[in-house]
Structures are given as structure tokens and as C-alpha cells.
A protein has these predicted regions:
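Short, hydrophobic, well-ordered secondary-structure elements
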Residues: 13-14, 21, 33-54, 129-132, ...
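A broadly used, surface-exposed interaction patch
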Residues: 52-125
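Charged/polar positions within long, soluble alpha-helices
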Residues: 22-25, 48-56, 110-118, 137-151
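Conserved catalytic-core segments centered on acid/base and nucleophilic motifs
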Residues: 23, 27-48, 105, 111-120, ...
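Charged alpha-helical initiation segments
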Residues: 1-37, 156-160
């Protein structure tokens, strides 16, 4: 049985990934890729936190000044690792494609939050699709089919018969 804190983080990960997919698939939505990336980064962070808690590890920043283990607190709560730190701790010296995908999206998220960017939708479809498929793969590997998203997500309907080259390429990847 999973610790409650791991289940709570999994619930947050599920909610964020579903909200991200909804935002991306909403017809006529502006900034769909921007919203998707921000929500997927939240989902991935919560997923990694759930993995660490499942494995008995606290994904919290430690104070460096004491001999005993002490944690950094913000607003009376331990400061959790952000996604970049989770990637370092989880993958360590390995650099699989999913890590590269997430590092790219983390850097892009910072730009989305702090600068104006041109329309990203056509160019980033493949990266967005990879982030979703990689999320589902890691979720299944770490927690099993019981926690899979495949039952809650559906393939979105399309209004057009034509498929932009980026979408066609992404569909061939998986």
C-alpha cells in the first residue's frame, strides 16, 4: 500500500495532466501549448514527488548548516524540490530521451512565464505529445496499471483531414 503522501501527490499529478490535456484539446483556445506545458510541469513534479515518497525518500531541500538532517521551510512547510532537481535525483547520471524532453520543456516554461513568445502550437506538438506518453510510461512503471491514465483520457476528435507535418512526425514516434 502506498503512503498517503504518495497517493496525494499522485492525485495531484493526475489532476494536472488531465487539466493540461483539456487545455490543449480545447477548440479555439489561445495559448494552448503554454497552458499545457505549465500544467504538465506541475504533473511531472507531483509524479516525481510521489515516486520519492513511495521509495521512502523526502523530496525536500535540506539545510546545509547542521549535522542533523534539517529541512528548508517556506510558509511552515518543507520546501519541495522543483522539477529540475527531481530530474537530477531520479535520473542521476543517466540521460534518457524523456529527461531531455523534460529539460527542454522546463526551460521553455521559464520563458513562457516571464516573456512573450510567439504562437508555439504548431512547432511543439511532438514535444507535448512525448511529455504525455512518457508520463504515462513512467507512471505505469513506478505504480502499475492501477494508476494509469489510459482509462480517463481519450483521443481528441479532429476537425480537419489534413495533419500538419509536426503532428504526423509525432504520431510516428509512438
Amino acid at each position: 500500500r502506498l503512503p498517503r503522501i504518495a497517493r496525494d501527490h499522485l492525485a495531484k499529478a493526475h489532476a494536472a495532466v488531465i487539466a493540461g490535456v483539456e487545455a490543449y484539446n480545447k477548440p479555439g483556445s489561445r495559448f494552448r501549448t503554454d497552458q499545457y506545458i505549465v500544467l504538465m510541469m506541475m504533473a511531472w513534479t507531483a509524479l516525481f514527488h510521489a515516486i520519492f515518497f513511495k521509495n521512502g525518500r523526502r523530496p525536500w531541500y535540506r539545510k546545509k548548516t547542521t549535522k542533523r538532517v534539517r529541512y528548508v521551510y517556506v510558509d511552515d512547510e518543507p520546501k519541495h524540490w522543483e522539477l529540475a532537481t527531481c530530474l537530477e535525483e531520479y535520473y542521476q547520471d543517466k540521460n534518457p530521451p524523456e529527461r531531455t524532453n523534460l529539460q527542454f520543456l522546463v526551460a521553455l516554461r521559464h520563458k513562457i512565464e516571464h516573456r512573450h513568445l510567439p504562437d508555439l502550437d504548431p512547432v511543439l506538438y511532438g514535444e507535448c505529445q512525448a511529455a504525455l506518453l512518457n508520463f504515462e510510461d513512467l507512471l505505469g512503471r513506478e505504480f502499475g496499471a492501477r494508476y494509469a491514465l489510459t482509462e480517463t483520457l481519450a483521443v481528441s476528435l479532429q476537425f480537419s483531414k489534413s495533419i500538419p507535418p509536426q503532428k504526423a512526425a509525432a504520431m510516428r514516434l509512438h
